[in-house]
Amino acid sequence: MNGVAFCLVGIPPRPEPRPPQLPLGPRDGCSPRRPFPWQGPRTLLLYKSPQDGFGFTLRHFIVYPPESAVHCSLKEEENGGRGGGPSPRYRLEPMDTIFVKNVKEDGPAHRAGLRTGDRLVKVNGESVIGKTYSQVIALIQNSDDTLELSIMPKDEDILQLAYSQDAYLKGNEPYSGEARSIPEPPPICYPRKTYAPPARASTRATMVPEPTSALPSDPRSPAAWSDPGLRVPPAARAHLDNSSLGMSQPRPSPGAFPHLSSEPRTPRAFPEPGSRVPPSRLECQQALSHWLSNQVPRRAGERRCPAMAPRARSASQDRLEEVAAPRPWPCSTSQDALSQLGQEGWHRARSDDYLSRATRSAEALGPGALVSPRFERCGWASQRSSARTPACPTRDLPGPQAPPPSGLQGLDDLGYIGYRSYSPSFQRRTGLLHALSFRDSPFGGLPTFNLAQSPASFPPEASEPPRVVRPEPSTRALEPPAEDRGDEVVLRQKPPTGRKVQLTPARQMNLGFGDESPEPEASGRGERLGRKVAPLATTEDSLASIPFIDEPTSPSIDLQAKHVPASAVVSSAMNSAPVLGTSPSSPTFTFTLGRHYSQDCSSIKAGRRSSYLLAITTERSKSCDDGLNTFRDEGRVLRRLPNRIPSLRMLRSFFTDGSLDSWGTSEDADAPSKRHSTSDLSDATFSDIRREGWLYYKQILTKKGKKAGSGLRQWKRVYAALRARSLSLSKERREPGPAAAGAAAAGAGEDEAAPVCIGSCLVDISYSETKRRHVFRLTTADFCEYLFQAEDRDDMLGWIRAIRENSRAEGEDPGCANQALISKKLNDYRKVSHSSGPKADSSPKGSRGLGGLKSEFLKQSAARGLRTQDLPAGSKDDSAAAPKTPWGINIIKKNKKAAPRAFGVRLEECQPATENQRVPLIVAACCRIVEARGLESTGIYRVPGNNAVVSSLQEQLNRGPGDINLQDERWQDLNVISSLLKSFFRKLPEPLFTDDKYNDFIEANRIEDARERMRTLRKLIRDLPGHYYETLKFLVGHLKTIADHSEKNKMEPRNLALVFGPTLVRTSEDNMTDMVTHMPDRYKIVETLIQHSDWFFSDEEDKGERTPVGDKEPQAVPNIEYLLPNIGRTVPPGDPGSDSTTCSSAKSKGSWAPKKEPYAREMLAISFISAVNRKRKKRREARGLGSSTDDDSEQEAHKPGAGATAPGTQERPQGPLPGAVAPEAPGRLSPPAAPEERPAADTRSIVSGYSTLSTMDRSVCSGASGRRAGAGDEADDERSELSHVETDTEGAAGAGPGGRLTRRPSFSSHHLMPCDTLARRRLARGRPDGEGAGRGGPRAPEPPGSASSSSQESLRPPAAALASRPSRMEALRLRLRGTADDMLAVRLRRPLSPETRRRRSSWRRHTVVVQSPLTDLNFNEWKELGGGGPPEPAGARAHSDNKDSGLSSLESTKARAPSSAASQPPAPGDTGSLQSQPPRRSAASRLHQCL
């Protein structure tokens, strides 16, 4: 609460009648036999959490004892005990009361049962009574892993039940307005009980007539005063005063208060005889009294009193039901003289500022009643003997017909009553004050007062004029012993204008009252001319010295400041005239004379400022501005200044009334005003200059926050003169006067700066200025910014204070500062200051685009520290031209790289969204943008954004969302926004499916029973932590929205799962085995969540556990374990346990088909669509020519794999197979057996499962499998570059088990060629020959060299492959035609975008190329063989022909291009050229099986 100790005062319940014959409790006046439903404290055991600690925070209040309990203490001490025997005497003192401010949800305190509002009673068995707030905090912090708290629950705490409005609504803000507008306290409901009326009468009842039975008999009660018909004779008044104070004093007549309510409002420990009070009020009173009795510790030697005396209810408790017609005072203070004469009216709320010695509230006393602590031992015997004691009122109760005496003054104007507190800082001050100061005639009845008072008229009932009577106790009883004086308290008044009061060491109080005529009754609303107020003491006596628990007090304050009640946060200065006189009985006060304030309440407001300035300061200002709290220079006293602008801004108009008008017109102008104590105002003239002196200054920002030019940014020495609304800067000093003012207003000559308007400005120490000392910053209302350097720290602080006090805007009411308006001004200031920064993208124009998101970011940035917010943008570079001599501590680091705030942090630490605090702001913002503009964007989340732009946005968001410009084109690209969202989840330290539950999700996805699988997944999702569950729910809901528009954006749940599966379902560690093994599960999990998001994240539980899928729905368990042996090792060519990566991917696809996956067949079919269509076209063309070639047989043989069947073509001749040509060259490639007898093995490439499977599934959303083939075959491209001819294959692709290879997808050469620059260059060289060859004869069917046919041939069954052997001439002719066709395809293909090439290039990093044992067949040897003579070109072509039938058509193209360029087609009869061909075919066939 920033050090403001809100005082819970008074006791709210109404008095209730109580049978007097009931025996009273030992301390609280309640019967011990009567049951009460109050259960007492509870004990809780808290266990410390390493993250949250104990999980609660505290707040602190100072609670004062009820008036009834305090009065009872005084009464019992005066009486010496009701039973006649001595009882220990005790004191009721204010307590430091600690409540629970906040309890973290699901924290240790919350689980233990601690709730907000509970009051601490004990900490680890030690009572908090007698301990300060800091001591209690230390007890808690020093606890081990467990903390035992004894608390009073909020619902059972009487203090909070009685003062809930005070405690929770008005604790942090000053009350403004008239006292009668204070609301009524909330009602308190207790079981009502009825009590019989009292059976015995008291002498008190006979003295005070009771017109109605509802009126209480206690004249101190406002209800008693409210009855106009009530007349109290002087003797009775004297007796009543004796009964309450131990002395005789008159009370005001009821006529003086005709406006007061007649309802009984007098809370007492027990009701007076004849009064009827509701029983519920009585029980509340009893409970509170009982609580106070148990809480307040007794001191040794004190006596216990068996009963409590009646007590007048505080007006602040009654919410001023007794308020009279309003006096022209707009402000309510806590200790104003409510007990004033009738014509003044009770306009101020009385707070129960209880006493430690006098144990009485100054406000609650009647206008004529006040007692010094030294009278507290006066026995109550005077009450018993009051009938025979002569009436001795020093001032009669003025009736309606008699005006009050002019010299009388309300008790609250007499001063404050201090107290001895448990806080050490309070007790250190009590030794300075020992007595009360009285300045009013009510104390004439005390034997120690010498009164000089004008005669007063008395009502007719008064039997005799007032006279001084010494009560039974002697003066010796009124003087405390020396050992007790240190703990005594004083009643003292803070006069409105802060004049110094000198102390005299007199023991006895002497009050002299001026002879002034009594004021007429009709002037009840006006100023009391006969009243005078003593001037205020120095700052040591002011409320500025009140310590607050949340901030340490300076030793200088503790040693020199005088004791003031903490409840007097708002001072009780009155608009009344001072009284001439001295008080010799008080060693601490002398009263100067003279009036110096007017009716405009400026003096009252000025008197409240010091305490509030102290309240809003923090510990940081003391530590950073050492000695800032007190500076004394020739009588000047500097208050502590807050170190933050906003906290002062909120109360600016409250503390500063802007001008010295009221001070200047005062009669005592020589006494410096408290609010101008920094300036030497005692020597000030009546000119308009408030402060002047030499300063260095430079201007940082001009109007509208624009950066000042270089000429204005230089330090200059000027003479500054502060006036009411401006700060003039000149090169030379000018004498004060009208001429100087006019010259300053004309201002600014050539070399002088224009006057700086300080209206509504912000001024504070420039903490960011490290190059110069004693610099303060001034920002005007039009956002001009200046830096000023003072001579020393005192001078700097004086300037700051003077500017603040004179910067109040016109029309601002200092007593009614509008916090909302101030906040709006600060927000406007921040917005403009943000726009004035050097960054272009922080322009305010950015707020016009996607304003909702902009406001989201601004809301989040508004929660940052006030220090960084309040510094304008220009402050970061305002010291560029300053000298390079830093000093002190650089509080704000410049260009400090902040920790990331959005990316790479845990979900719990991300900035939360406004609609859901557990969803990161960046996730909500990106999803909102995509849903607003990208629901119909084709391929949203599939098409990536520019990596550089995404990275720049990440850096910007990591710096904080405050400077985001949504008009920037980077925020307009939907693909960038979608990539930003994916990047956020990719960079999470712990994935959305947390590490500890990752394996559970994978296992759950592999459950065959569909219903059980769904239930298990749902349970696992529900078990995720809160932030992860809410974020997953939000994201899946967003993806469901995207999938609902799949007709336009083409992003079905399956496609979205391919994008988000590897990102969301993963582990923190990139494990290659998990990638290969779990990749299909990751896709399936995300797809299932999107498809059934409503069921997974529904709030209601299904009683029947119904699942959205049938129990017979199969679950695909992808068979990709064959990839695991290939991770990190090379498999021999003939290893039957291995398989090629490409064939393995086909195999894994094929394994899904029998499981009836929804898209298994599509994944197989889409990859063949384009190739099949092209084959059919070429087949029809070839049949039209009537040619029977091996190409026809190849096409027909491939039909079963492609979905078309032609059994008749199975017997057609095929290209040469390795088994048939092996004997022709046994020397070259003899080792392996026929490849068709063993499984294929990949000896070339080991591709990571993530890349293989990603490219495998990526074909799902590709219309013609272009994306899949391009990305998936990049590895083949790389192999072709490194070992292009070694992988040469022919139509022997069919070698190997046909059943396993029938589902092998085909790859088109125009998909594989874009990244193969080597093949492109070779094809460019061979294009003329190829084209000529292609056009040289009739169009033949697609040769084996075509991209599509080469892959299709691999799917031919082995039997068909062995049955057909085309002639060598046919093979040569088809080879040439295939070369021409491929070159044509390369020329017609569409170039790929840079982004596609980059992705393929990244995919290639997963490929590891190894050497093969087939080193005899490499490109160099092939070139040597091809160049050996005429047969070699044909051999080369035939060799290339073999290559074309393999799966890796890209490699065949690379090998084929040089062959076509190196030689012409040979003659048909040239058969010798093919002698070396069969061995090469055999080797190529073996390699093809591996591939």
Swiss-Prot record:
Tissues where the protein occurs: Expressed in placenta, prostate, hippocampus and brain medulla. Also expressed in brain tumor, salivary gland tumor, head and neck tumor.
Cellular component annotations (GO), alphabetically ordered: cytosol; extracellular exosome
Limits of the Rho-GAP domain: 905-1097
Region (Disordered): 15-34, 204-280, 385-407, 449-530, 831-851, 1126-1155, 1175-1367, 1420-1491
CDD domains to which the protein is assigned, alphabetical: PDZ_ARHGAP21_23-like, PH_ARHGAP21-like, RhoGAP_ARHGAP21
Disulfide bonds: none
Record-level GO BP terms: regulation of small GTPase mediated signal transduction; signal transduction
Ranges of biased composition (kind: Polar residues): 1138-1148, 1245-1257
Covalent link (Glycyl lysine isopeptide (Lys-Gly) (interchain with G-Cter in SUMO2)) residue numbers: 854
Key words, A-Z: GTPase activation, Isopeptide bond, Phosphoprotein, Ubl conjugation
Keyword Transit peptide (UniProt): no
PTM annotation (Phosphoserine): residues: 361, 372, 423, 517, 583, 611, 623, 659, 662, 677
Residues annotated as domain PH: 688-808
SUPFAM superfamilies: GTPase activation domain, GAP (SSF48350), PDZ domain-like (SSF50156), PH domain-like (SSF50729)
Site (Arginine finger): 942
Ranges annotated as biased composition (Low complexity): 1345-1366
Sites of Phosphothreonine modification: 656
UniProt cross-references to InterPro entries, sorted A to Z: PDZ (IPR001478), PDZ_6 (IPR041489), PDZ_sf (IPR036034), PH-like_dom_sf (IPR011993), PH_9 (IPR041681), PH_domain (IPR001849), Rho_GTPase_activation_prot (IPR008936), RhoGAP_dom (IPR000198)
Keyword Cell membrane: no
Residue spans of biased composition, Basic and acidic residues class: 482-491
PROSITE patterns hit by this protein: PDZ, PH_DOMAIN, RHOGAP
Functional summary from the UniProt entry: GTPase activator for the Rho-type GTPases by converting them to an inactive GDP-bound state.
Name recorded for this polypeptide: Rho GTPase-activating protein 23
Species of the source: Homo sapiens (Human)
Record gene name: ARHGAP23
